[in-house]
A protein has these predicted regions:
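Conserved N-terminal ligand/cofactor-binding loop architecture of enzyme catalytic domains
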Residues: 1-17
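A short, flexible beta-alpha/helix-coil linker loop
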Residues: 31-34, 56-58, 128-131
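Intrinsically disordered or low-complexity boundary/linker segments at protein termini
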Residues: 23, 27, 40-126
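Charged helix-capping and loop-helix junction motifs
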Residues: 64-67, 137-141, 171-173
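Acidic, proline/glycine-rich short linear motifs
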Residues: 1-5, 122-149, 176
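A general structural motif
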Residues: 101-113, 134-140, 163-167
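Soluble or luminal CAZymes and related metallo-dependent hydrolases
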Residues: 3-7, 32, 63, 104, ...
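Structural beta-alpha unit
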Residues: 13-50, 149-178
Length: 178
């Protein structure tokens, strides 16, 4: 628990130094592993943005994946997954927006609109779109139109799933487009 408190203090200090006018919070919660996803989802629902590290890789456990999925699918709020090296700025100029035509993806895209509007470019990334479905001829096209109507500069990238995890494909694409 002491390590968690130290991490909380360090995160609060880092956030305060990055954007002094930003109103934010970092919370420590003690819970059973089985209830962790419910706690994360409940906190995420009343947040404007959830910031998490990549759930896979060295030093990551099964709880990291569960936390990310709870925030993404149950939290109904935008989730910013920070790459291992961190972010160069608190206001990114290029945003990669994962799109799979799901309700959760649409809710997250709508709620992320303030962030998307401030970006210079939003890359809508569709990985292995379905061969049959309403967007089969133009995957991500309808979302792109929605974003453009809101003043967002957006384009669609359709990628093949060439790595075991979708998150790895997204992370690689984010690095590729800087």
């Amino acid at each position: 628990e002491g390590e968690a408190r130290e991490t909380e203090a360090a995160l609060n200090a880092a956030i305060g130094a990055q954007v002094p006018t930003l109103r934010s919070s970092v919370e420590s919660v003690v819970t059973q592993l089985g209830a962790l996803t419910d706690v994360v989802a409940a906190r995420a629902r009343y947040s404007d943005l959830v910031v998490l590290h990549l759930p896979y890789g060295k030093g990551r456990g099964v709880e990291d994946e569960a936390i990310t999925e709870a925030a993404l699918f149950e939290g109904m709020t935008p989730v910013l997954v920070v790459p291992p090296g961190g972010m160069a700025t608190a206001q990114p100029k290029r945003i990669v927006l994962a799109w799979n035509q799901s309700r959760e993806a649409l809710v997250a895209a709508r709620r992320a609109m303030p962030f998307l509007k401030r970006a210079e470019m939003v890359q809508i990334v569709v990985i292995d779109p379905p061969a049959h479905g309403p967007e089969r001829s133009d995957p991500g096209g309808q979302l792109c139109q929605l974003l453009v109507r809101h003043g967002v500069r957006a384009e669609v990238s359709v990628l093949a799933r060439t790595l075991p995890r979708i998150s790895e494909v997204l992370a690689r694409h984010a690095r590729d487009v800087n």
